[in-house]
Amino acid sequence: MNSRTLNGLPSGRFCRTSHVAFPRVDDRRVLNGIFWVLRSGAPWRDLPVYYGPRTTCYNRFVRWRQAGVWDRIMDALAAGHDAAVQMIDTSVVRVHQHGACIADNNHQDIGRSRGGLTSKIHAVVDNNGLPVHLALTPGEAHDNRLCSVLLSALLPQTMLLADRGYDANWIRELARQQGAWANIPPKRNRKDPICFSPYLYRARNLIERFFNKIKQCRRVATRYDKLAANYLAFVKLASIRIWLRANESTP
């Protein structure tokens, strides 16, 4: 052993050890692990070992989200939506205590409403109930807060379906300026008459069924994620699965 010392210790104590290079975990295994967490709602630490190390799955989920991978996939699929009819609505999700352990919940789209800590999913779907736009706000936010953003790309001749919570003159004007027609039931206190078709309005159940489908994924039905960006990424992953299943069934 070398007799030279460093701070009174033999220099041999500081020799570099050999590094073992582990093979990269296959992306398909990692993606299956991410979908397993999405469907089961389990913590990352409970991820089965055959999906790879849990830290690897979580890190790639976050890195792909930060790189915009989930957004690009969602946008590419939504580009083929049926623009004849679009429906907008929201759904409230309870926030688990594991997702509410940060100092400032307001910056993570967590609000306090009658049911406790909640977040609200805003969605726009097409004539087939397939998602087009998705967003997230605190649970106490009004349903029409994001209308100016979610409805900014309506095509001419599009029929917009929404419930009474969206009966506002500025929303109808927003649709009219884009050449679309807002078929929204009037509020009971509305004085000026409007054009509304109850028969066409019956198709609005498709967006309710969309929320039912994504909430079959337990990671969406209850928010366990502290970061709003991570939770919205899970919502988009559930929506991507709906799009893929719809495309598989199309001849």
Describe these PLM feature segments.
Residues M1-P251:
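Short alpha-helical elements
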